């Protein structure tokens, strides 16, 4: 399990004005919480956060968080959530969750389709229904990505949660029948089928109208 070093400062002010002041001074308001601790308002450097996300992404990160003035040198945490202003692309707030590496946690892991399926070779397309899945495991057992082999999938085939095996130490807490990905037919085929259905409906409606006219 890789731990990424990140520094933080205690945060005294609360409310929108205090948060705005932090953002205007190259810092992002954040909070650290955990099962056996009171939540701690903190802040992190905007530059440090940006660099971390650019290098490591924002999913499934475990961090060695050193808070200035804390009672311990550092805490093992995971990045739980980042809130962003999607218009200005600025960080608004960050949630960190303290963890115990010997205890199981729930975390989201990205899903990746691998291999060129029979269906894709025939013109179909892989459609990811769920780009991330929640898993329950110890931090050290967490896979960086859930890879699904699509080699033998034909058009119309799907992969469900019950078909994904991540080992005995990793649990997927989703419904076993949940569809994760599917191989869909080419768009042109779908449009042709829809067109044929519309044509059949038009013919049936015309025939019905003609029958009504004859009866009158």
Curated annotation (Swiss-Prot):
Coiled coil feature spans: none
CDD domains associated with the record: Ribosomal_L25_TL5_CTC (cd00495)
Gene Ontology MF term list: 5S rRNA binding; structural constituent of ribosome
A Gene Ontology cellular-component term: cytosolic large ribosomal subunit
Acidic residues compositional bias, start-end: 189-216
Sequence similarity: Belongs to the bacterial ribosomal protein bL25 family. CTC subfamily.
Role, per record: This is one of the proteins that binds to the 5S RNA in the ribosome where it forms part of the central protuberance.
Assembly with partners or alone: Part of the 50S ribosomal subunit; part of the 5S rRNA/L5/L18/L25 subcomplex. Contacts the 5S rRNA. Binds to the 5S rRNA independently of L5 and L18.
Protein name in the entry: Large ribosomal subunit protein bL25
Organism of origin: Desulforapulum autotrophicum (strain ATCC 43914 / DSM 3382 / VKM B-1955 / HRM2)
Gene: rplY
């Amino acid at each position: 399990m890789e731990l990424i070093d990140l520094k933080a400062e205690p945060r005294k002010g609360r409310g929108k004005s205090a948060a705005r002041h932090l953002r205007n001074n190259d810092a992002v308001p954040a909070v650290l919480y955990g099962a056996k601790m009171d939540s701690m308002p903190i802040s992190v450097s905007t530059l440090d956060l940006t660099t971390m996300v650019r290098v490591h992404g924002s999913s499934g990160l475990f961090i060695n968080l050193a808070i200035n003035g804390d009672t311990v040198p550092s805490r093992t945490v995971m990045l739980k959530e980042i809130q962003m202003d999607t218009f200005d692309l600025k960080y608004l707030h960050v949630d960190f969750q303290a963890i115990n590496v010997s205890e199981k946690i729930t975390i989201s892991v990205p899903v990746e389709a691998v291999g060129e399926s029979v269906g894709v070779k025939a013109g179909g397309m892989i459609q990811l229904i769920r780009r991330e899945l929640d898993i329950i495991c110890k931090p050290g057992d967490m896979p960086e990505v859930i890879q699904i082999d699509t080699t033998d999938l034909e058009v119309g085939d799907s992969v469900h949660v019950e078909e994904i095996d991540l080992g005995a130490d990793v649990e997927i807490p989703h419904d076993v029948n949940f569809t994760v990905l599917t191989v869909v037919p080419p768009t042109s085929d779908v449009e042709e089928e829809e067109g044929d259905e519309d044509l059949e409906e038009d013919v049936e409606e015309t025939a019905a109208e003609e029958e009504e006219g004859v009866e009158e």
